[in-house]
Amino acid sequence: MERDTVKFKVYCVEEYRRVHGLTAPQTVDLFERYGVFGFLDEPALRWQSLDNTVIDIDEYIEARV
């Protein structure tokens, strides 16, 4: 995995957990359960704000529940 991709995914985990009041392990479990890490490989997500990325992650998870 490319270093920039890893850094982006870490930023997303941290922002998502902060917004939703989760721990890092809870967030990683959630992301793994719903395939969010694969979704975060989408290059277009890196060009928007983290706030918008969190919204996109929420929508991605909701579509899979």
Which residue ranges define each predicted feature?
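C-terminal alpha-helical interaction appendages
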Residues: 1-65
